[in-house]
């Protein structure tokens, strides 16, 4: 496994891979890797000749400076895990390598609508930062496929739209959420949880299951369903942030013709803002 930190060296290897006709898969990450990331790597390995994992804590997508500062950086441990998985390349650039002129005045990629709705409304600039860095990685690495986790449901929808709108010839692969045995979705931010909070954390998944059961049963009183769910979360020790029930295919409000719903949930537990989602097939 080769660790690459500079753009010239990355471009050199990408040119060689292209000349050799290799099928390249990209797994973009911000590091602090867990089993969910390893599932992305496994999916990439099954679909390509060469796997490149990027590790870059992207300052452009953080809406709070304190969150950027305390985001876990575990490059050595991450590389050890990826080496065991027989990843071919790790691209781990410094911020100055990606944004040599700084963020002020940086050209960015913005996806209208999806960037500012739902999660984007509560985290201004977040999705603009995501689409910009992913676009830069696509331009640099020129992958044939790129793997993203379905845990970040809105982010995946945003990337798919960007790829379509910008005419990238890249297959976007969504990989299902990996959960702990108690149902908690694996996330780098779970590291913020205390031992006691970790015991409470699966409650978010349980509340989503309760919402799903009501939707499957035909209940469409969405405001009431959400209000009850928020109350349940608060009683469990969370601070409910945002719960939405949307059309899984459009992320717009549910209509009578919606075939699938997605439950999008975000809640604070101590210093950790946990997000999760669950898709439900609706009776027609």
From Swiss-Prot:
Family note: Belongs to the pantothenate synthetase family.
Residues the record lists as binding (R)-pantoate: 61, 155
GO CC annotations, alphabetized: cytosol
Compartments where found: Cytoplasm
Binding, beta-alanine: 61
Function in brief: Catalyzes the condensation of pantoate with beta-alanine in an ATP-dependent reaction via a pantoyl-adenylate intermediate.
Catalytic activity: (R)-pantoate + beta-alanine + ATP = (R)-pantothenate + AMP + diphosphate + H(+)
Primary residence: cytoplasm
PANTHER family: CYTIDYLATE KINASE/PANTOATE-BETA-ALANINE LIGASE, PANTOATE--BETA-ALANINE LIGASE
Additional free-text comment from the UniProt record: The reaction proceeds by a bi uni uni bi ping pong mechanism.
GO molecular function: ATP binding; pantoate-beta-alanine ligase activity
InterPro entries, A to Z: Cyt_trans-like, Pantoate_ligase, Pantoate_ligase_C, Rossmann-like_a/b/a_fold
SUPFAM superfamilies: Nucleotidylyl transferase (SSF52374)
Biological pathway: Cofactor biosynthesis; (R)-pantothenate biosynthesis; (R)-pantothenate from (R)-pantoate and beta-alanine: step 1/1
Gene for this chain: panC
HAMAP family in alphabetical order: PanC
Protein name as catalogued: Pantothenate synthetase
Active site (catalytic residues): 37 (proton donor)
Organism: Salmonella dublin (strain CT_02021853)
EC number: 6.3.2.1
Binding partners and assembly: Homodimer.
Residues at which ATP binds: 30-37, 149-152, 178, 186-189
Domain of life the protein comes from: Bacteria
Keywords: ATP-binding, Cytoplasm, Ligase, Nucleotide-binding, Pantothenate biosynthesis
One GO term (biological process): pantothenate biosynthetic process
